[in-house]
Amino acid sequence: MSALRQNDRWRWLTAGAVAVCLLAFTLLIGLLGWQGVRAFWPQPVDQYQFQPPQGAPLMVLGETLDRQQQGDRWRYVVKTGNRDFAAPDFRVIVSQGEAQTRRPAEALVLQRRSGGNAYGWLVELREDNEVLTARDRDALLQQRLKQVHEQLRQASNIRRIEMARLNAQLESLQQQADEQRRGGHFSLQDQSELDANSAALHKRFGALAQQLAHLQHESQRDTLVLRDVQGDDHLIPLAQVVAAWYPNSLSLGQKIGHFLSQIWQFVSDSPTSGGSENGALPAIFGTVLMVLLMSVIVMPLGVVAAVWLHEYAGRNALTRLVRIAVVNLAGVPSIVYGVFGLGFFIWLIGGTLDQLFFSRSLPNPTFGTPGLLWAALTLALLTLPVVIVATEEGLSRIPDNLRQGSLALGATQAETLWRVVLPLAVPAMLTGLILAVARAAGETAPLMLVGVVKMVPELPVDAVFPYLHLDRKFMHLGFQIYDLAFQSPNIDADRPLVYATALLLVAIILSLNLLAMVLRHRLRER
């Protein structure tokens, strides 16, 4: 009877621990979700008239973040925006008595590429300083915004794809010519061919430059005049505006549509203002690409090491020592792996590769500098113990009778391993992959040493051969969270983006893990 009571105590204890873990995870997701939604949901804009304890009345327009009564005084925290002409964009105001408040339906919010939001009233739209007239100025504003965004998109494609491809061809021609000169095989005919090819490429580049300049000029023609709460007018180019809306006059359906469009803009656009505003596409792309490349590297190494330890290595002191070393590697701080990756992969291996295969680019390093390949290798080394242990656990659960039966039927040990043992161990391998992805996607400290940066001019994948550039630096959601939370000059404005980026990172990790779990379940059914 006492044994049953003891078991009941342990059962309740374990059930309580599971409940606490689930509650903590739910609260974490709830906090990230609630705070992250605030970054995209259109907040109402209030117009206040404050009466400070001393001084003249104060007019303020913005989003109300907090309001507290302190005796006969009221304390307000208002996001007033307009950072470039009415800094700061967050204000704490103490009013003598409750402030007079109203929500003007015509109040306009502008999400800009830099400088934060702008709040005010639309006075007029201009094209080349000529005032545009229309019955519905809001519809005209949205139409002009779409037109400007399309021009900016075309200009970006020319700059990132077509001009980048021509630049790569010009650099390749110049490097080939320099290599021939160093080898003493550069003739007058080679020089004439080089001049002809370079002239043709420069001609195409000049045509693209003219087209790019035309698009940039067209995108700068449209401007709007915004009147702030103090009555001052400000000229804002539409090329600097990401989105414009009237939050106080939106219906529920319009708010949902705006919310979805803001989420899409966040996950599909590039960041501006040093990475502290607008989109997170490069960070999403870099995170997923790095995790996939790490998985491709770590899975073969981990599976081969586990198979050797369990199937081929004898039970001796050396094997026990290797297992102890593998298990202890999982406890090494991640920053140590970053230092190892910097010293071994980048300086030693990368520097050697540059001298052997990319000497014509020296002293500019190609692989002797932090990049995507070294980040993936470093995290593969970091997660290797997890894959080895999980795979070896799966191999140990396979009955020896299956191995012995296969050998008795005439199969070799290699055939038994390939046709009997490994198919049964695939779910365990995928379990190791799930654990490796979960850890690698959230690592930040080692990546700061081996390849991640705050902003990148180009993605590791583009239209220039060889299309996947393993030597390029990349952005990562974990580092972006750190940068927004601790390195931003305006943390109050970036706080919602911190929560939104953290929620996005959790969603990506859960999606990758769910994909691996579905694959494991299907293989298990087979």
Language-model features, listed with the residues they occupy:
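Transmembrane alpha-helices
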Residues: I388-E392, I398-P399, Q413-G451
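Membrane-interfacial helix termini and adjacent extracytoplasmic/periplasmic loops
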Residues: F259-N278, Y337-L381, G451-V452, V461-Y467
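Membrane-topology segments of multi-pass transport proteins
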Residues: M1-A15, L22-G275
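Interhelical loop and adjacent transmembrane-helix boundary motif
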Residues: G274, G451-L503
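Non-cytoplasmic
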Residues: V339, G343-I349, M429-H469, Y482
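Transmembrane-helix boundary motif in ABC transporter permease subunits
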Residues: M294-V326, V339, W347, A516-E525
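Membrane-embedded alpha-helices of multi-pass transport/permease systems
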Residues: P300-A305, V336-V339, W374, L381-L402, ...
